[in-house]
Swiss-Prot record:
Binding sites annotated in the UniProt record for Mg(2+) 2: E41, D78, D314, D316, T317
Stated consequence of mutating D34N: In CONDSIAS; uncertain significance
Family to which the UniProt record says this protein belongs: Belongs to the ADP-ribosylglycohydrolase family.
Co-factor remark: Binds 2 magnesium ions per subunit.
Outcome of mutating G270C: No effect on hydrolase activity
Membrane-spanning residues: none
Entry protein name: ADP-ribosylhydrolase ARH3
Binding site for substrate: D77, K146, G147, S148, Y149, G150, N151, G152, H182, L235, I271
Description of how the protein assembles with itself and partners: Monomer.
Species for this entry: Homo sapiens
Chain residues that bind Mg(2+) 1: T76, D77, D78, D316
Cross-referenced InterPro entries: ADP-ribosylglycohydrolase, Ribosyl_crysJ1, Ribosyl_crysJ1_sf
Function comment: ADP-ribosylhydrolase that preferentially hydrolyzes the scissile alpha-O-linkage attached to the anomeric C1'' position of ADP-ribose and acts on different substrates, such as proteins ADP-ribosylated on serine and threonine, free poly(ADP-ribose) and O-acetyl-ADP-D-ribose. Specifically acts as a serine mono-ADP-ribosylhydrolase by mediating the removal of mono-ADP-ribose attached to serine residues on proteins, thereby playing a key role in DNA damage response. Serine ADP-ribosylation of proteins constitutes the primary form of ADP-ribosylation of proteins in response to DNA damage.
Amino acid sequence: MAAAAMAAAAGGGAGAARSLSRFRGCLAGALLGDCVGSFYEAHDTVDLTSVLRHVQSLEPDPGTPGSERTEALYYTDDTAMARALVQSLLAKEAFDEVDMAHRFAQEYKKDPDRGYGAGVVTVFKKLLNPKCRDVFEPARAQFNGKGSYGNGGAMRVAGISLAYSSVQDVQKFARLSAQLTHASSLGYNGAILQALAVHLALQGESSSEHFLKQLLGHMEDLEGDAQSVLDARELGMEERPYSSRLKKIGELLDQASVTREEVVSELGNGIAAFESVPTAIYCFLRCMEPDPEIPSAFNSLQRTLIYSISLGGDTDTIATMAGAIAGAYYGMDQVPESWQQSCEGYEETDILAQSLHRVFQKS
């Protein structure tokens, strides 16, 4: 993509790097992706026409100007965990693994019917045990000591990128926050990649090539450690699986036309972090430019959500990750009020974003 086109796409009132608009847009985009995407979760294939009908139902009713939407779309464990993470950061004004782990577990105990996976429920139950002294141990014990490589650490991580402005801190605390539930490097490296994508989006990068180059540089370093190499090898995967998928994203973006089936075949749409985080990044980058199948009335953030959901599979999580990146990039101006007001918890989400900006953003 030409640098000028991407720079123009980033305009849209997002303002300066790490602006309040970007913070609000990030969490609003994540909430939208979860709420809208959950309607299609676990559908192997999703008809684009159906998605377009679904999102058009969120638009204001003609003939009733000024009418507000009411909350109709419920959030899942994706948003529940993302909110608990942010609430911990705000309560401690820093990353605190014990507080965050307890908030995750208490959130599950309070409201268990949000679509949590069986594996993470086991972790939460152990964390709720007063005898638990090491909050990382329950996750390490999963899957015969190999840990989980699911996308649960990545789906909730955006708050880390909002709270910390340095790449080093983003990587460090994304890893630690993910390791509370996902001890495999293939799980926590996915969370780091997602956090880095949000981090870069908050800066307003100037080209997709540069965006990918920066992500690739970070991930090649991270995936070069012995544990990452071992974990990939044990699954029969290529070394540096995230790096290889970032390269594949570049190849797909260079092609004039790519079908949804090709995207799913090359990048995935599953619950594994390596089958969903790169996919979310691709959705964000691809949808900076118009899509002939998506009406031009939809802006870039809306297009990102629509396209990511149309890939099927783990739609709520891929869309919440793509929405977080796009929202951080475009800012609050591209979040449609009627869509936002259709989502459960939208007001609290916005308050959390504003609080994060007030507490963590240095003027």
